[in-house]
Amino acid sequence: MKSCGVSLATAAAAAAAFGDEEKKMAAGKASGESEEASPSLTAEEREALGGLDSRLFGFVRFHEDGARTKALLGKAVRCYESLILKAEGKVESDFFCQLGHFNLLLEDYPKALSAYQRYYSLQSDYWKNAAFLYGLGLVYFHYNAFQWAIKAFQEVLYVDPSFCRAKEIHLRLGLMFKVNTDYESSLKHFQLALVDCNPCTLSNAEIQFHIAHLYETQRKYHSAKEAYEQLLQTENLSAQVKATVLQQLGWMHHTVDLLGDKATKESYAIQYLQKSLEADPNSGQSWYFLGRCYSSIGKVQDAFISYRQSIDKSEASADTWCSIGVLYQQQNQPMDALQAYICAVQLDHGHAAAWMDLGTLYESCNQPQDAIKCYLNATRSKSCSNTSALAARIKYLQAQLCNLPQGSLQNKTKLLPSIEEAWSLPIPAELTSRQGAMNTAQQNTSDNWSGGHAVSHPPVQQQAHSWCLTPQKLQHLEQLRANRNNLNPAQKLMLEQLESQFVLMQQHQMRPTGVAQVRSTGIPNGPTADSSLPTNSVSGQQPQLALTRVPSVSQPGVRPACPGQPLANGPFSAGHVPCSTSRTLGSTDTILIGNNHITGSGSNGNVPYLQRNALTLPHNRTNLTSSAEEPWKNQLSNSTQGLHKGQSSHSAGPNGERPLSSTGPSQHLQAAGSGIQNQNGHPTLPSNSVTQGAALNHLSSHTATSGGQQGITLTKESKPSGNILTVPETSRHTGETPNSTASVEGLPNHVHQMTADAVCSPSHGDSKSPGLLSSDNPQLSALLMGKANNNVGTGTCDKVNNIHPAVHTKTDNSVASSPSSAISTATPSPKSTEQTTTNSVTSLNSPHSGLHTINGEGMEESQSPMKTDLLLVNHKPSPQIIPSMSVSIYPSSAEVLKACRNLGKNGLSNSSILLDKCPPPRPPSSPYPPLPKDKLNPPTPSIYLENKRDAFFPPLHQFCTNPNNPVTVIRGLAGALKLDLGLFSTKTLVEANNEHMVEVRTQLLQPADENWDPTGTKKIWHCESNRSHTTIAKYAQYQASSFQESLREENEKRSHHKDHSDSESTSSDNSGRRRKGPFKTIKFGTNIDLSDDKKWKLQLHELTKLPAFVRVVSAGNLLSHVGHTILGMNTVQLYMKVPGSRTPGHQENNNFCSVNINIGPGDCEWFVVPEGYWGVLNDFCEKNNLNFLMGSWWPNLEDLYEANVPVYRFIQRPGDLVWINAGTVHWVQAIGWCNNIAWNVGPLTACQYKLAVERYEWNKLQSVKSIVPMVHLSWNMARNIKVSDPKLFEMIKYCLLRTLKQCQTLREALIAAGKEIIWHGRTKEEPAHYCSICEVEVFDLLFVTNESNSRKTYIVHCQDCARKTSGNLENFVVLEQYKMEDLMQVYDQFTLAPPLPSASS
């Protein structure tokens, strides 16, 4: 049985405490208090409640047989609230956690958030409670606060990798990363969800659909097509999934040119869509797509019928009406086209395509004034992709108008009503009222998805009236309209009659009887239905994900409707979500997500992780405009009125008058951090998907919601003093908040305030650029040695964080201080630990054996108490628990293992996290106080070498590794050492191994200090860098031809610009052209492996001339002790460049140092940021929806300047060596044609080891593989190295201690469970092992599938992934790589060595 976070014993204890509190209250009443009788819980009810927490979310069926459970939860909430009120909030923190769980299960999200907030504020070690973090993540997910939800879910998996709802977490992480366009992370989490055999609210087929759709989103159409077709072969595939898969395949064949010729594609598209409609006849989306297909092959009547069906099924769709308008315009029916376009823009005031088409229609009818108004509205839309072309057209029309005689337009008869008149035409006017009515009808609908759609039910059938048109009459009407210009008088009369009847019929259909016209939640302090706060808007229905793809074929920018997809605790607005303000990006795609606006530039990233008791706006996160600021203040000040925002559709005028603001990027802050949304209403996100609405349509499964729309309410029991609304975060911050953008009462702030103990944090601004370093220069030598001696060993690295992991009371936000304290902190003595034991016992909660039953039915498979559980989760906590941290570093291994056995007997599981619980790692905040602006461009530390003696001068090593120097440039190294750089020239490389593989990155040629989007209109952080492969010979040919082409261009410029100097001409011309775009495409040859000493013997031998501290292999290099090859780290890699080739921003793998030598002949420009600021850059990446660890990003220097981030900037010339210190962030661009060689180095320092371990833990939190196996490396260091630095020794020894305990405890658990452990010793140079599923390092005990073991392929799993795949491990064998006696011997023999008499190079 798996650990599921907080122990049920804790819940039972809370319930028992609740009983004690009740007795006290009863005694108070008996003594004379006159109070109303408060509800009380029986012992049986308290026991039942002990098994209810966030882990049951989505698995409790209130609408089936769970009425008793729902009633019990409601009663418990009333009892808890009553008790807390009477105790004036002075109750145990667990009460608030339980109250949060109960409200979450009842889907009362505002109350759940409020209760979780109080628990968070009261419980200093809240991070140990996985169920709390999970519940908090679910609430954030519900409110579309994706960045918060991601952090909460990641921390659950970090503190408890075996969490029983890990599959639910991976599913939601996959969805959120997909929306954030982090496709690699999304795919990884979907795959992790797929391999988990635990129950989930989505079926595996639905998860496979998400993976297929992810490929489609990435424009990997062949992979997507293959995945969809494979999914159709699944047995017992539900009709909902089948219909959606067929819909996707149909639309892909219509839109993707790669799938065949047009005729074949359209034929397949129509077949797939027809099959989809057979599976789900009520899909308005499929009808719309079918109409588009018919339209593209000229079947006008079929297209009209399909569009009509689409409108009937999915009600208002701006895309459908726009497509109808296009058809009418093609049929030369301008009046009908006008009405259709007006319907489209009333449904979606920002529908750029409809505005442009409408403008074209007016222009064709010679009404330029109306055309200008339409074009202006199109340019105001964020989805408008050709603003410049429209602006030019507007100028042209305005110039024409100026040249016309005055009054000529007024005297001219208009073919069409003006835009203002058209706004009130009968059909559009009725449409808007109809839409409001239909939305209300859907809110009152029962929990009926009708195949996955929230479909409105038709009105009750009434007696047929004379205006009711039969299908025959409707067909006749269409025929008459199609031939309007060729009708005789009788036919024209018939057409008028039929059209009038048609309008009457529409009016009747648009007013369903008994349906309210106003959408409202009726919830106190909650938003209305049109509020920008993303909440559930359909009583009894699941929230939906409405992801809509923008079609890009015949009408760029015309988009489909928005079907929805329900998901347990989906963060998306429920019910049918009209695309009322959806946007397009030219012919690209758009994702609509409920009512929440998420853009690719990171608006969702602006959602802060709020700080407790803070009163100011998020730092560097959100800029409020006045239009958004006021509603927020009003909401906080008015306890009975929610933040109301109009839907901005028909309430807006035709010329862009808006209730709030016509187009500006103002944002509304949601109550209690529910998300930041664009004021235009429905959001968009650039995406590459096709039909994302259909993509996530139908995929609902097993959960039902119960309440309607809800805002965030401050209940009495949840209000902090002063009525300040605080929202919990899973990272706690302390300190004041500098640089807050504004101050609005009630909105917590998110500022990382770093406290004192950050190790290796350089004091910026102090670095000076020394002159020539030479052992013959006594003055300089003294300066250098003084600097080194003052800073190395006795500087910031001397500080060691003594926070006790198990009794953690307050921690700063630096990763250095908390995340890796399990390895990288000094361990307190047993005596000091014992003094804190009483505080730590309650926090070391024993995981429970399983979830209690609900209504007599077990929620998980219970295990017989006679059977020994692998994870030892059946033990109850005992008052005699020995804190794991009381095991000192210094006792022998035998004492350690004896203590481990006691730990097991006392009820601790074998989970490393429970043995050594540490707070999840967090990025450091920006160093405080911030540097003054004149210190943000510091000089780069540079050393000039004259001879070999200078290169081997000992202080050079000390200077480079000094944490105060994030980077050092060693000038003239090649000349001083007489290195033959020609061995690495392109010519020599081709002669040596011309067919050697080269990884190619295709990039855009840009100015070094700028990064523009492909159109050249705005600066962005995302750096285009697409991967492919070639050979050295082919890249050499490209490199040479690029140089020749540049020479030709230079000669042409000289002949055309003789009036100016060459330099002025080139710089000004390039600067202007590059900013305008489109940019020239270049290719960068990167990561060329030079590890083979047979192929590259001469080259590698030449590098042995280097000083020991920068060599690829040396005794003082940690990476030389890994024991196997890590390509590019302890081997050499080569880079072949043309001007503009970019290495995007990054820190080295596991924060190791790096060495880079420029071979030449051209230069490179470097940009460097000190390690202490990586948290700031991580925040910028989050804002821009980029993955700091794995993404491709190029920082905007203006952003860094505003955030007070210092940037070292320098030129690396041929022969210069650049030393990047541990953890330094850097990015590089080639100025000329050049080659570079590089590798990593690990100095034997406490600072390097500490930063490496911190990144190891951060990678684990982020589900990213650590390239350096730190556990494996630490044991090899203990075998090979004598360590004299006490801080480094303690960190390594503690890592050994921790892993020794893990191995012993796991061994004992496996043996007790009857699982055989098979000896499988390590071979020479065998690589360290990683889990094939989650990619964490696996040490000593390898879980290998039976099949791979028999085949000798050895596919390794970690314990947690093995158990998720096979609960009882019956499909796995366990291989042991080290004898416990060997590990004990290494541990005992690793002792602190006496200090060396003097430092050496």
UniProtKB/Swiss-Prot annotation:
Residues 1046-1063 have a biased composition (Basic and acidic residues). Residues 437-449, 624-652, 660-724, 834-848 have a biased composition (Polar residues). PROSITE patterns: JMJC, TPR, TPR_REGION. InterPro entries: Corepressor-Demethylase, JmjC_dom, KDM6_GATAL_sf, KDM6A_B-like_C-hel, KDM6A_B-like_GATAL, TPR-like_helical_dom_sf, TPR_rpt. The keyword Lipoprotein does not apply. Keywords: Chromatin regulator, Dioxygenase, Intellectual disability, Iron, Metal-binding, Methylation, Nucleus, Oxidoreductase, Phosphoprotein, Repeat, TPR repeat, Zinc. It is found in: Nucleus. Changing residue 270 to V: In a patient with chronic myelomonocytic leukemia. The modification Phosphothreonine is found at residue 827. Residues 1-1095 are annotated as: Interaction with SUPT6H. PANTHER family: LYSINE-SPECIFIC DEMETHYLASE, LYSINE-SPECIFIC DEMETHYLASE 6A. Escapes X chromosome inactivation. Belongs to the UTX family. Histone demethylase that specifically demethylates 'Lys-27' of histone H3, thereby playing a central role in histone code. Demethylates trimethylated and dimethylated but not monomethylated H3 'Lys-27'. Plays a central role in regulation of posterior development, by regulating HOX gene expression. Demethylation of 'Lys-27' of histone H3 is concomitant with methylation of 'Lys-4' of histone H3, and regulates the recruitment of the PRC1 complex and monoubiquitination of histone H2A. This is Lysine-specific demethylase 6A.
